[in-house]
Amino acid sequence: MNYPLKSLKIIFIFLLIVAQFPASVVASEYASEIFYKIRTESNSSSESIGSYSKGCLSGGMYLPSHAEYYDVLKPSRNRFWGHPDLIEFIELTSEQIFNEFGNGLLIGDLSMPRGGPMPYGHKSHQNGLDVDIYYEKKPEFQMDRFKLETYNPKSLLSPNQREINYKLWTDYQYDLLKITSKNDRVARVFVNPLIKNEICKIAIKKGDTDWLKKIRPWGGHYKHFHVRLTCPEGSKDCINQAPIKQSDGCGIELQSWLQKDKVFESNSTKIKEWMLLSELPNSCKNIIRD
């Protein structure tokens, strides 16, 4: 069928408008909704982009749900993706813990397949460099899919959340945090302020405080601690946090946390959905279309 030239021009202009339409719609959507809907990794090279709380992940790797040295809880959330450095860190650390203590690790959330803001649970975990690790040891029995989804690790705090539960606290938790924080890749380890206070008391008594500065007090974090790695080589658009002060963090700063309600803050804070894709680094727009 032959179309008049004028009609062809109209069709061409219409197609140009339609081609641009998805981009304009995506730019106005909440970023958490966009990234949550993407169920697979991007095809581009591995890079952590932007900051931990305003970024995305290129070429993410997934962490298998089962391994000899660890299990990943709640795999249906699809938050088991990270930069290759993070995946390697988890694999090597869990193997080290197994070799030294005879138990594996329970792993919580990493990032979504392409990072980005999550609709609930975390404000960070956006650029593939954050992981939650539980204080509780990996059970000796084989965890099936149902167990991985429903297993609920115990809190290290007492039921009133005002002190350490010494029925659960052992030297293992102290050693686990020490091994983790002394890793050169680790930038920070976030723990509940009461847990930071406990390890400060033990470390000061032992004269073993050189590793404490990376252990940062933060609300919640009574079932798990949050490990954050430094920006990897080759991730030119990754933004590190400011350097930590040369202090063990057991003084005035910690005391201010212990006096605040933040000690008892829930781990399941609802995330505001106001962050738009346009607020993330420009590279993130390409990542969602890759």
Name these PLM-found stretches:
Residues I34-K37, F89-G121, F190-L212:
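Extended, low-complexity, intrinsically disordered C-terminal regulatory tails
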Residues N2-F12:
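Bacterial N-terminal signal peptides that target proteins for export
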Residues F21-A27:
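Sec/Tat signal peptide C-region and signal peptidase I cleavage site
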Residues F98-E100, S124-L129, S181, W218-H221:
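Extracellular/periplasmic catalytic domains that process cell-envelope and extracellular macromolecules
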Residues M112-Y166, V227:
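Acidic/His-rich structured neighborhood in mature extracellular/periplasmic domains
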Residues S28-S32, L148-D290:
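Catalytic cores and adjacent binding grooves of peptidoglycan-active enzymes
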Residues I11-Q20:
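Bacterial N-terminal signal peptides
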Residues Y36-G108, W169-L176, N183-V186:
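Active-site acidic/histidine clusters and adjacent loop/turn architecture
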